Amino acid sequence: MRFFLLMAVIYTTLAIAPVHFDREKVFRVKLQNEKHASVLKNLTQSIELDFWYPDAIHDIAVNMTVDFRVSEKESQTIQSTLEQHKIHYEILIHDLQEEIEKQFDVKDEIAGRHSYAKYNDWDKIVSWTEKMLEKHPEMVSRIKIGSTVEDNPLYVLKIGKKDGERKAIFMDCGIHAREWISPAFCQWFVYQATKSYGKNKIMTKLLDRMNFYVLPVFNVDGYIWSWTQDRMWRKNRSRNQNSTCIGTDLNRNFDVSWDSSPNTNKPCLNVYRGPAPESEKETKAVTNFIRSHLNSIKAYITFHSYSQMLLIPYGYTFKLPPNHQDLLKVARIATDALSTRYETRYIYGPIASTIYKTSGSSLDWVYDLGIKHTFAFELRDKGKSGFLLPESRIKPTCKETMLSVKFIAKYILKNTS
């Protein structure tokens, strides 16, 4: 059975030509009133728009800045309509395919080898996990927490001294396939944590007293697809019953206010919630792991892009969590710490009031499970490159984010029981 599944995946991959995005554009639109919002919503009835920010048409609101991708064929219609209704816009990306190719602006030190300065495909990441085990056997262990619908392994790296039970932080990257800077950070974190142990006082103390569970790529199948077939792919690769559209948005698939957002029940949307809470193998693997380590995990951090934000619960309601003052304090100091490296400015706050309401998110699920320090990073940039952050900005992004994560970890070590 496994052989036939593998052959089906290989056949599918070979049979489908990779998507090209020649002369596709990314627009940024400022919606100043209800009429503007209505015009944009009406456009989606006849033109396919790929929303970059917010994630879907039902999330747009007055006074919001909206980023979306459109085909070359439809871009002139979009421009004419926006100008006709006096809606302010700018074109962030004039040729998406060109921007995709420009993303790889760092040369290989050694061809084909894993690099922290470059984006790495899934095969390189798997090989990297093996090398981390070999290099730091006393500090790193690899746990297979499950597998995907295409039978790829879901690996968590446990970082920390192996003696005894201790506090832990769970971190995941790459829940959305096209957000490549996210897995790049998880790799950087593991590298820096192990490299600086015994040299950096703060990291040494953290690793002596707590563990980090790091899931470098949450959405493995989608990540592979974004490398081989469709750079703009977001969801996983599960098949949907009674629909030819593929995939579920894993960050809408958690069992927390799962069905409260409009239109997330449509399989062809990028924000499709799935047929049931935790229906996806990836979601189930992560939730089972966190439940089984509930006594030790004191904080949860998930990494996304883009927008330069540090978000706290809730997303499904404007109601604030009981310890919101504590969470906001941590977020404020963490973003201040981040800015000390390159003066990169992040905003912070609850998901619902800072960006938009959302349902079924990992952040809210973990918080409601009982882990009361949960954070979501939206990494660089603010939209100029969007999901196509050039490789030359990987290291600066990771270095500044590391400062923020180290502060959060120190706070958790000191202030949780």
Swiss-Prot record:
InterPro entries assigned: M14A-like_propep (IPR036990), M14A_act_pep (IPR003146), Peptidase_M14 (IPR000834)
Q: Looking at the record's lineage, which domain of life comes first?
A: Eukaryota
- Signal peptide from the UniProt entry: 1-15
Where are the active-site residues found?
Answer: 378
Q: Which residues does the propeptide include?
A: 16-109
Task: Give the location in the cell.
Answer: Cytoplasmic vesicle, Secretory vesicle
Record's catalysed reaction(s): Release of a C-terminal amino acid, but little or no action with -Asp, -Glu, -Arg, -Lys or -Pro
Q: Which GO terms describe its molecular function?
A: metallocarboxypeptidase activity; peptidase activity; zinc ion binding
Chain positions recorded as Zn(2+) binding sites: 176, 179, 304
Instruction: Give every Peptidase M14 domain span.
Output: 118-412
Q: Name one GO biological process term.
A: regulation of angiotensin levels in blood
Q: Which GO terms describe its cellular component?
A: extracellular region; transport vesicle
Q: Which UniProt keywords apply?
A: Carboxypeptidase, Cytoplasmic vesicle, Disulfide bond, Hydrolase, Metal-binding, Metalloprotease, Protease, Signal, Zinc, Zymogen
Its EC number is 3.4.17.1
Classification via PANTHER family: MAST CELL CARBOXYPEPTIDASE A, PROTEASE FAMILY M14 CARBOXYPEPTIDASE A,B
Its family remark reads: Belongs to the peptidase M14 family.
The identity of this protein, by name, is Mast cell carboxypeptidase A
Q: Which organism is it from?
A: Mus musculus
Query: What is this protein's gene name?
Result: Cpa3
